[in-house]
Amino acid sequence: MSARRREPGLVAALAFLAALLPNAAAQTLPPSPTPTSLLSRPYGRSVVDIQTVRAHPGGVLAVQVRGGRWTSANTLLDGRRGSIALENGKLFGIIPLALDTEPAEHKLSLFFPGGRRRGGSTSVMVPVTGVARPTRPRTLTPDALASAGSQTALGHARFLLAAIRTRDLKAYQSGPLRPPVEGPVVFPFGGAEDYGMEMGPVKDGLMGEHHRGVDYDVPAGTTVKAPGSGIILLARSLAFSGETVVIGHGRGLVSVLSHLTHVSVREGDVVSQGTAVGTSGKTGLGALTPHLCFSVYLHSLNVDPEALMDATLWPAVK
């Protein structure tokens, strides 16, 4: 038998959460800071550019099609469908990679509208590389363990998950996100979290085997700013994440700011990148010390916030 103890209420709650959340040829190629990470493939009179600098489990791919008259294209990667659309006059999109993506080559397919004469499809094999991530122990108090499986906590989780799954075709944000606070990162996205007990088949819940965001070491009361322009989808106190702000940036991109002490925006507010939305703190079951947890979801897949802050993904659409 395993030496680790089980907490049935918590495991059931985490399993419930996990179930709800399934990551032109004549033109000159844009310069790239890391040329070896940029894949370019001709397709008719067009060129498909794929930036793989952040192609790791929980990372993203940036795709741009140069040339042609298409205004959109559908994508398929590891069985997940997506799309790219015009951004600042460029056919461009960010495609998420799930945290459990195997480090290997994966086939990315693009499907263009217009029938046989003007449409068609093409595929590119894209390398995904593994990354080393740390582990940290996590000790929850008996009260926190009891609260984790409560109906109140599960109800709060539904609010958060509904916000994460919001679909909005409008693009509020163009270009990379920015850090919501100034401070050192003390624990990265995707790091393993050891709760000292069996977590069950949790793979992509709000708590579980891996950290869902980036933790910044900042004192309570630090101003927290919107990492990108968008609409406030949720601004309320939740059991797991405490005082929480969820921002919808459009086109499937959602950011979550957790454990705040104070929230200064309301649901439905439209904010610009850099707008103050609250102050950091230590609220919620998941906060053991004052800090800010910043999480990002793209088409409901949890991805590395630092990948979406990488300006090299947008070199050609500026």
Predicted feature descriptions by range:
Residues 28-125, 130:
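Cationic-aromatic interfacial patches
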Residues 66, 219, 237, 275-276, ...:
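Short, surface-exposed secondary-structure boundary micro-motifs
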Residues 122-242:
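Surface-exposed, glycine-biased beta-strand/turn segments
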Residues 227-264, 289-291, 295:
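Zn2+-dependent peptidoglycan hydrolase active-site motif and core
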